[in-house]
Amino acid sequence: MWNNQGGFDGGSGMGGGGYMQSPGGFGSPAPTQGEKKSRSRSQQIVPCTVSQLLSATQNDEVFRIGETELSQVIIVGIVRHAEKAPTNILYKVDDMTAAPMDVRQWVDTDEASCENMVVPPGSYVKVAGHLRSFQNKKSVVAFKIAPVDDMNEFVSHMLEVVHSHMVMNSQGAPSGGGSTMALNTPGRMGIGDSGGAFSGGNDNPTNGLTPHQNQILNLIKSCKGNEGMAFEELKNRLHGMNVNSIRKTVDFLSNEGHIYSTIDDEHYKSTDGD
């Protein structure tokens, strides 16, 4: 839960299911009795990765990851871009599981508070908010953004992602069977999805790549066209990252046999993407 200093007290708010009850202080509207019955899980705060949020399905304004209904979510990542407008601040938050996620925080124009301060790019943050979709583009509308000073909190968040979704999947699965969710967590975290085993993310448990390298490899894998992904598109998807760093990573992945060029030296496909 959020502590009195505006930070996030990660451990104490976890329930037996690995996810957190939404305190009244989060500003969520009180549900009606009907909503309580039909959407019993939607008031939980669910720890997620960006990849999970981007792949969440939507039906009648309700988002789900597998059988888990989402309303309030938590992600942890690094701010790649920050842009302040009169009424809101738009961030791009990158947890290295997919392209950076748009996070919008509305500001109080009537008073100068810490909520109105822009978190600078390069800072790690923990974001709590609501998943939204507009014109088929998902984003998070944040009601709390707190800086992360200890990188152990990033590791802890990924473990919470694994634990909470395992528990909620097992609770929602039919007797005698279970649904499996690909968590798609950063490769160096060693977090997989096979019954909770720590087996490495992104369908490549022992590739030995860094999170940055895995992120670029997964973006290239996601392109199903015969021509592969253009380097220009890769730059656009990784907005805020240093272009030279992207180029060096692409060259490394090519030299190591993870990707190959297609129609020219600016288009790439994964060697195991078919």
Swiss-Prot record:
GO terms for cellular component: chromatin; chromosome, telomeric region; DNA replication factor A complex; nucleus; PML body; site of double-strand break. The keyword DNA damage applies. Residues 73-147 bind DNA. The keyword Acetylation does not apply. CDD domains: RPA2_DBD_D. GO terms for molecular function: damaged DNA binding; single-stranded DNA binding; telomeric DNA binding. Residues 7-27 have a biased composition (Gly residues). Differentially phosphorylated throughout the cell cycle, becoming phosphorylated at the G1-S transition and dephosphorylated in late mitosis. Phosphorylation increases upon replication fork stalling. Residues 1-42 are annotated as: Disordered. Its main location: nucleus. GO terms for biological process: base-excision repair; DNA replication; DNA replication checkpoint signaling; double-strand break repair via homologous recombination; mismatch repair; nucleotide-excision repair; protein localization to chromosome; regulation of DNA damage checkpoint. It is found in: Nucleus; Nucleus, PML body. Keywords: DNA damage, DNA recombination, DNA repair, DNA replication, DNA-binding, Nucleus, Phosphoprotein. Component of the replication protein A complex (RPA/RP-A), a heterotrimeric complex composed of RPA1, RPA2 and RPA3. As part of the heterotrimeric replication protein A complex (RPA/RP-A), binds and stabilizes single-stranded DNA intermediates, that form during DNA replication or upon DNA stress. It prevents their reannealing and in parallel, recruits and activates different proteins and complexes involved in DNA metabolism. Thereby, it plays an essential role both in DNA replication and the cellular response to DNA damage. Belongs to the replication factor A protein 2 family. PANTHER family: REPLICATION PROTEIN A-RELATED, REPLICATION PROTEIN A2. This is Replication protein A 32 kDa subunit-B. It comes from Xenopus laevis. The lineage of its organism: Eukaryota, Metazoa, Chordata, Craniata, Vertebrata. The gene is rpa2-b.
